[in-house]
């Protein structure tokens, strides 16, 4: 962290507005250890179409899933999990079919949010990573956003199409809508545990309440972003994601408004 702060002054502070990192956030340690922190998309728009095609191809990622499974098998043999292993990474969605091939008994929480809201947010997050390592003024937001648009389409539609063709897997999948999670996170966690028959305790719930109280949204600042900033046309995006958006009841938002949190009187802008 100290080295990065010296090499790119202001980078960590800006990134923390959208994705807080600290020595206590264990998932960040795992992401770095596994080389998983989206390094492959940093400046890949400059790598050409062939790189992009290979990046999102499903079948050639099978060895990666096999290696990961072996890694956790060895880790579990040394230090067995008390209940289960929890893996969190949005890029799993890009290669959704391989999850079930490698982990047949997987219990999967699939999160959903309006893609017209998430796309510029993801662009801003990834821009926060990239821009510190480019020459001043050389970062092309529109060019960079084209790759993020392809990634977003894959992340959304690969699981969506897989589920249409594999209804037998529905018992292993829990759909978590962002608005419901944001408005009442503890209830959603209870539903997840109930669906997958995982033990839920009062002590666990109390720890969640303490965490939520200490980590309210906006604690580390807020990012501002828009579709237009990254060269996106809202109507074009809506048509591209229409099947998915209609299925989950999403429309074109009037403005970027967050849903109302439990205990709040109004939405957060």
Give each language-model segment a name.
Residues 1-85:
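PAPS-dependent sulfation machinery
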Residues 71, 77, 81-105:
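Flexible, glycine/threonine-enriched loop-and-boundary segments that flank and lead into catalytic domains
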Residues 88-89, 99-124:
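Conserved phosphate-donor/acceptor-positioning beta-strand/loop module used by diverse small-molecule
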């Amino acid at each position: 962290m100290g080295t990065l702060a010296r090499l790119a002054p202001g980078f960590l502070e800006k990134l923390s507005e959208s994705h807080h990192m600290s020595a206590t956030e264990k998932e960040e340690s795992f992401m770095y250890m596994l080389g998983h922190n989206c390094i492959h998309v940093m400046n890949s728009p400059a790598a050409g179409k062939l790189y992009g095609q290979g990046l999102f191809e499903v079948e050639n990622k099978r060895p990666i899933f096999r290696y990961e499974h072996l890694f956790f098998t060895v880790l579990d043999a040394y230090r067995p999990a008390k209940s289960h292993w929890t893996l969190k990474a949005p890029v799993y969605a890009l290669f959704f079919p391989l999850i079930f091939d490698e982990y047949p008994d997987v219990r999967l929480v699939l999160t959903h949010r309006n893609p017209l809201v998430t796309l510029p947010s993801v662009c801003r997050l990834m821009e926060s990573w990239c821009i510190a390592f480019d020459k001043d003024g050389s970062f092309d937001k529109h060019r960079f956003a084209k790759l993020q648009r392809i990634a977003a389409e894959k992340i959304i539609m690969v699981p969506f199409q897989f589920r249409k063709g594999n209804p037998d897997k529905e018992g292993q999948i829990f759909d978590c809508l962002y608005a419901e999670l944001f408005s009442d996170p503890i209830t959603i966690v209870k539903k997840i545990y109930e669906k997958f028959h995982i033990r839920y305790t009062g002590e666990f719930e109390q720890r969640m309440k303490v965490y939520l109280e200490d980590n309210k949204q906006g604690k580390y600042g807020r990012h501002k972003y828009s579709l237009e900033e990254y060269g996106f046309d809202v109507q074009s995006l809506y048509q591209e994601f229409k099947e998915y958006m209609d299925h989950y009841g999403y429309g074109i938002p009037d403005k970027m408004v967050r849903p109302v949190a439990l205990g709040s009187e109004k939405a957060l802008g």
